[in-house]
Amino acid sequence: ATYPGEGHRAERMSFTIPFSMVDEYDMPWLVAGSGLNDNQYAGLSTLLRRFFRDYGDDGTYREFLTFLDDPALQEELHESGRVHEATYDAVKRRVRAVPGGVFDGDAVPITDLDHTLVRPGGLSVIPTYHLPTSRQKEIVVLAVSSMLVGDKLSNDPRSDRIKQTPLLIGMDEAHNFLADADTVQARQVVSTFTEAAKQGRKERLGLFLITQDPQDIADPVFKQVNTTVVLNLGDEEAIQSVNIPTALAGKVPYMQKGQMVVYSPDNSEPVEL
């Protein structure tokens, strides 16, 4: 997809998500989407390890599809008891459902742009509104943010620039990416960002989650949020989820532009501004 870039004069740079990130940053869930059970996820992990062992760090998504089409491989893994044939087929269907154009596009890999993406005093924006499907948006947002979080929390980061630079990651429509769900993929994603919220302060990493549906953000992540800024919300469930005093909660649906409630339980009482 092409980003039009209208309405601003900021420098623009195209990038692609290299399939190798799945291996480099241990993110099998990036190609799994939703719906894999524990056995299928384990099967996917086995297949990815075998693929990158055979094809090297530069293995591509298209090569992985070709790799999965090998009936001899499927038979070998089934007979050895490592991946049941039905599990293999389920993984294959899920991997093939990844929208085209997400991986290995004709642009610079995002992993090679760490010094452009992260700059002391700089601001980088990753727009996704031009991407045609929610699955494409999900892959791009989670790939980039997980790369940043992974290097920040790692003792052996791939990028020293990311590791050493104080960083605030803002995620718009966060409920679309950090929702609680009973799938192994969702648990992996939520675990990553829960750890980021817990440990981020030590590594000079902050998470700034923006949402109209705070009640849909997974509890393990939401409970780690230290400061909440509440603007106008109309949904009763959303208002209840931000846990502010009743007197202030009653004002939230009627707040005008510029009005807000700021609540930082560790630092102060809720304040209306």
Q: What positions do the PLM features span?
A:
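P-loop NTPase motor domains
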Residues: A1-E195, K202, M260-N267
